[in-house]
């Protein structure tokens, strides 16, 4: 296990390993997305209150869930970068930030679209929505910081600190509907107790969440590989690996 973790810190080994992983994971991701989308958007029954307008949850919920998970990845990479000074952690941080930002933006936009027929308005300064907007700003802040510094080491340290400080927002997002009066409904999926959503709607939602996790992983790996290509474009190991492929 420790040998594998140590290998992940090696750019040449990671580049080769990630290429193989992407080739396997990409068709799985596409299949899961297609099956989940067809199941949720076309096969699942309409909601007895919201009709077909609820179907946007098959995009909204997976995007929101994986956006939060992506922040954990970025913050963990930031901690590794600060403590052990591992360069691949910096690459992970930089690659995760734009992916997380896009997912958060998708969650906010689809939430607004869903909110119009449900709440009668596109936007309210609800605790859950506001904390998700802060999450978007945190992701964009990391992207901007990496671009603002000429010194990559200084940029990575600044981004790591911002990522770790931003972790305080994550429990606020999770618990906002419990801590404050909120228009946003409580969690529909529960691991303890009965879920608030019927199984005919729940199963395609779970499948879409898995599909979005796979999509995040593939996109993250591709971003990391692109960063390695740019950073090590003159390195012999990269030319050899690209030539062999």
State each model region's role.
Residues 1-245:
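Polytopic transmembrane helical bundles with strong interfacial aromatic enrichment
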């Amino acid at each position: 296990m420790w040998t594998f973790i140590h290998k992940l810190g090696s750019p040449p080994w990671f580049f080769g390993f990630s290429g193989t992983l992407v080739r396997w994971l990409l068709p799985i991701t596409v299949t899961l997305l297609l099956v989940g989308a067809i199941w949720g958007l076309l096969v699942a029954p309409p909601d007895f209150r919201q009709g077909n307008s609820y179907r946007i949850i098959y995009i909204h919920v997976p995007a929101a869930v994986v956006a939060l998970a992506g922040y954990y990845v970025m913050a963990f990479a930031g901690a590794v970068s600060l403590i052990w000074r591992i360069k691949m952690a910096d690459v992970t941080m930089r690659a995760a930030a734009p992916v997380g930002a896009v997912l958060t933006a998708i969650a906010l936009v689809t939430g607004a679209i869903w909110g119009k027929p449900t709440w009668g308005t596109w936007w309210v300064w609800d605790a859950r929505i506001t904390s998700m907007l802060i999450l978007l700003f945190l992701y964009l802040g990391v992207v901007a910081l990496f671009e603002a510094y000429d010194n990559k080491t200084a940029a990575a340290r600044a981004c790591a600190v911002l990522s770790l400080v931003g972790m305080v927002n994550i429990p606020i997002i999770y618990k906002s509907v419990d801590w404050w009066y909120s228009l946003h409904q409580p969690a529909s999926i529960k691991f303890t107790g009965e879920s608030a959503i019927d199984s005919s709607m729940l199963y395609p939602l779970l499948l879409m969440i898995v599909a979005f996790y796979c999509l995040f992983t593939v996109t993250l790996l591709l971003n990391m590989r692109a960063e390695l290509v740019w950073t090590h474009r003159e390195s012999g190991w990269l030319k050899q690996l690209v030539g062999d492929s």
